[in-house]
């Protein structure tokens, strides 16, 4: 007969108890009442937070946006085709966040920071909340360093500083994206990290931008966040916040960043779609009441940090599309009131061959000359004044038949100055080249040339100055001032090049 030893049994029981490690935890769950159009209504989820991530049975993730008395409105981050009525949903206890690291540079990702360029996973040890509070008043300092775009019209008359928010606004097909991509190209060697966020764009347009950046070697300091037109509205709404979180990661590490939102009209439309499907009351143009807050909390994250926080910066260039030049629509007026100025692109100028088609008259920068180097201030003031007078005169000259010689000269000068502002796409100019170009125009050196010869002469002058008078560039880059010595060098170069140019044209 087998004897039962009590100590053995107690040892076995003790071992089993020690091995038992099943965790007891409370899971907040709910049931799907209704699903469709990227929205799910959930019964239950009693303790869910606003903005919390929830997980459906088949793996889809959603965000709890509407917390009502008897159900929860969830927006889906996917098509949700496999979700069925009655299936279970559990709250994750997390707010939307993304991984962040240096490894994102040069990659194309979606709104959930997953790579979509087919080049493998991205390693990241840290994460940041997609929606994080903007820096407070004490954490900021006023904008004082220039962020050069490489476009004469902007850098001389509508300057942008590091930490500023400057809106690019205009009709479709007026070159808004071109201005933004040229600005990215011009950051080469400036130690600025660029983030380009494409919201609701055609996939072919995004591919074109990425190709341009790759060909020009700009992808190594750029991250592209893309949610194309066929993406769910939730992801189009989230994409700008994902871009901002990535830019903030670098900003708080004492780096300078530039972020482009292309474009916020599409984000507002995606948010309107979500809100209407969630049955939130519509307001003006059927947008929900909090559409202003949608953009203000995004754009307020752009800042120039104080010296205590390392003086990093995040410069935002949001893009907004207008319908036939109507700047007084809801989204344009909202974003104009949030930003520190706007660059207005006109379809009429674009069609007249003036590209970039910047309407200097109604474009402003509320930071102004604080975001310019001294040398640019010295030459740009005169350009602004002469162009403003030219626009007035041109309107007047349409009605007057006989104009005196002085007026004719002023009109001729204005036409050449307008010609000088024209630039090819993807050909940004350095500050030194811009200063030289503006000085040549405002001091009458182009007056004797035909309008058709102006651009050719300026291109040749830039090459001549670079090869024969390299000291000019050195003086301006080291002193940031247009000194008498620099002026003398420039005058000599203009005279010499003009003589050569006249002989060439005669031949």
Swiss-Prot record:
Compartments in which it is found: Plastid, Chloroplast thylakoid membrane
Keyword rRNA-binding among record annotations: no
Keywords: ATP synthesis, ATP-binding, CF(1), Chloroplast, Hydrogen ion transport, Ion transport, Membrane, Nucleotide-binding, Plastid, Thylakoid, Translocase, Transport
Gene3D superfamilies: 2.40.30.20, ATP synthase alpha/beta chain, C-terminal domain (1.20.150.20), P-loop containing nucleotide triphosphate hydrolases (3.40.50.300)
Keyword field contains Nucleotidyltransferase: no
Bilayer topology term: Peripheral membrane protein
EC numbers, comma separated: 7.1.2.2
Catalytic activities: ATP + H2O + 4 H(+)(in) = ADP + phosphate + 5 H(+)(out)
InterPro entries cross-referenced by the UniProt entry: ATP_synth_asu-like_sf, ATP_synth_asu_C, ATP_synth_asu_C_sf, ATP_synth_F1_a_nt-bd_dom, ATP_synth_F1_asu, ATPase_a/bsu_AS, ATPase_F1/V1/A1_a/bsu_N, ATPase_F1/V1/A1_a/bsu_N_sf
GO molecular function: ATP binding; proton-transporting ATP synthase activity, rotational mechanism
GO cellular component: chloroplast thylakoid membrane; proton-transporting ATP synthase complex
EC class (word): translocase
List of residues binding ATP: 170-177
Residues annotated as site: Required for activity: 363
Quaternary assembly: F-type ATPases have 2 components, CF(1) - the catalytic core - and CF(0) - the membrane proton channel. CF(1) has five subunits: alpha(3), beta(3), gamma(1), delta(1), epsilon(1). CF(0) has four main subunits: a, b, b' and c.
Function field: Produces ATP from ADP in the presence of a proton gradient across the membrane. The alpha chain is a regulatory subunit.
Family: Belongs to the ATPase alpha/beta chains family.
Protein name per UniProt: ATP synthase subunit alpha, chloroplastic
């Amino acid at each position: 007969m087998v004897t039962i030893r009590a100590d053995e049994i107690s040892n076995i029981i003790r071992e089993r108890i020690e091995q038992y490690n099943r965790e007891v935890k409370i899971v907040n769950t709910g049931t799907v009442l209704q699903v469709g159009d990227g929205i799910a209504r959930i019964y239950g989820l009693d303790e869910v937070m606003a903005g919390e991530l929830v997980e459906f049975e088949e793996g889809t993730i959603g965000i709890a946006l509407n917390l009502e008395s008897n159900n929860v409105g969830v927006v889906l981050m996917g098509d949700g085709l496999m979700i069925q009525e009655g299936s279970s949903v559990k709250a994750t206890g997390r707010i939307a966040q993304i991984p962040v690291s240096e490894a994102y540079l040069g990659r194309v990702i979606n709104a959930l920071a997953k790579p979509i360029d087919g080049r493998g996973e991205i390693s990241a040890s840290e994460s940041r909340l997609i929606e994080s509070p903007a820096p407070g008043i004490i954490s900021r300092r006023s904008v004082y360093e220039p962020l050069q775009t490489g476009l004469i019209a902007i850098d001389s008359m509508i300057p942008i500083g590091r930490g500023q928010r400057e809106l690019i606004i205009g009709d479709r097909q007026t070159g808004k994206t071109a201005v933004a991509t040229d600005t990215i190209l011009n950051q080469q060697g400036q130690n600025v990290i660029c983030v380009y966020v494409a919201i609701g764009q055609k996939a072919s347009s995004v591919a074109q931008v990425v190709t341009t950046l790759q060909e020009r070697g700009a992808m190594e300091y750029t991250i592209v966040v893309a949610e194309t037109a066929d993406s769910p509205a939730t992801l189009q709404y989230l994409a700008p916040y994902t871009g901002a979180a990535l830019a903030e990661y670098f900003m708080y590490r004492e780096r300078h960043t530039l972020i482009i939102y292309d474009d916020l009209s599409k984000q507002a439309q995606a948010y309107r779609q979500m809100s209407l499907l969630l049955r939130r009351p519509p307001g003006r143009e059927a947008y929900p009441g909090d559409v202003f807050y949608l953009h203000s909390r995004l754009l307020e994250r752009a800042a120039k940090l104080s010296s205590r926080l390392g003086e990093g910066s995040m410069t935002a260039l949001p893009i907004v599309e207008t319908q036939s030049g109507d700047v007084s629509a809801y989204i344009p007026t909202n974003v104009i009131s949030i930003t520190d100025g706007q660059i207005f692109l006109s379809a009429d100028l674009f069609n007249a061959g003036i590209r970039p088609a910047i309407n200097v008259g109604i474009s402003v920068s509320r930071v102004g000359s604080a975001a310019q180097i001294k040398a640019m201030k010295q030459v740009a003031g005169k350009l602004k004044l002469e162009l403003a007078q030219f626009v007035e005169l041109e309107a007047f000259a349409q009605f007057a038949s006989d104009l005196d010689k002085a007026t004719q000269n002023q009109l001729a000068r204005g036409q050449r100055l307008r010609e000088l502002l024209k630039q090819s796409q993807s050909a940004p100019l350095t500050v030194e080249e811009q200063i030289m170009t503006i000085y040549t125009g405002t001091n009458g050196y182009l007056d004797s040339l035909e309008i058709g010869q102006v651009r050719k002469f300026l291109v040749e002058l830039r090459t001549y100055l670079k090869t024969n008078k390299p000291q000019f560039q050195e003086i301006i880059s080291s002193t940031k001032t247009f000194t008498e010595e620099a002026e003398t060098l420039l005058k000599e170069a203009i005279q010499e090049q003009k003589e050569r140019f006249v002989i060439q044209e005669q031949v």
